[in-house]
Amino acid sequence: MFDMSRYFTTIVIFVLIYPILMHSSDDLRANPEVYIGKDRKTQIATGKNYMVVTSDPMATQAAYDVLSKNGTAADAAIAAQLVLGLTEPQSSGLGGGAFALYYDAAKKSLITIDGRETAPISVMGDYFIKDSGEPMSFYEAVLDGRSIGIPGTPALLGALHEKYGTISLKKLIVPAYNLAQYGFLPSEGLSKALKSDIGKLDINPTTRKYFYENNILINHEYA
């Protein structure tokens, strides 16, 4: 018998990561969506059994397909996050951290999972101070790699799946794997972010080749 209760279990994942593509804090204060090139738009949507909301249609489709196959909200969130790490690297990814808020309708319980990234144990208070005694600028720190923390998102997804998942991880990675292996067109938001970061990302040969030399993005390493 089809169990409708699974579709009234709600999950929200907030992904926090130092984006690959960043603007100054002044830009973000004025418009927090500026670095992904998204306009503030309102759209009304309805659903009878379940609903998926992400910032990327491909991630939304991956999660929707999981729910249509009787997967749980946890399964859907994992599939969506794996796709988002590929299609919206300026905002999200396995190299960052996340928080999960999960409501189990059957048990009427709400849980949270802290998967925030952490700083290396060797980091001290002078980590972002130059030899001259001056603090690094924002971009000096980011491009130097010192702003990268120890990822927490993979552990969070693993804990979420262990407790609430019903579909194997091997199946949940398929949408992201196919996109990474065979390619996808960058979204409008990613395209705008890449354009705004010309002069930064294209300095590095690896990011230049991946983001700027092909219209279709293929990421075999991610796959």
Placement of each model-derived feature along the sequence:
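Sec/Tat signal peptide C-region and signal peptidase I cleavage site
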Residues: 21-23
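Bacterial N-terminal signal peptides
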Residues: 10-19
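Noncatalytic scaffold domains of N-terminal-nucleophile
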Residues: 25-61, 65, 73-74, 78-223
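Bacterial N-terminal signal peptides that target proteins for export
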Residues: 2-11
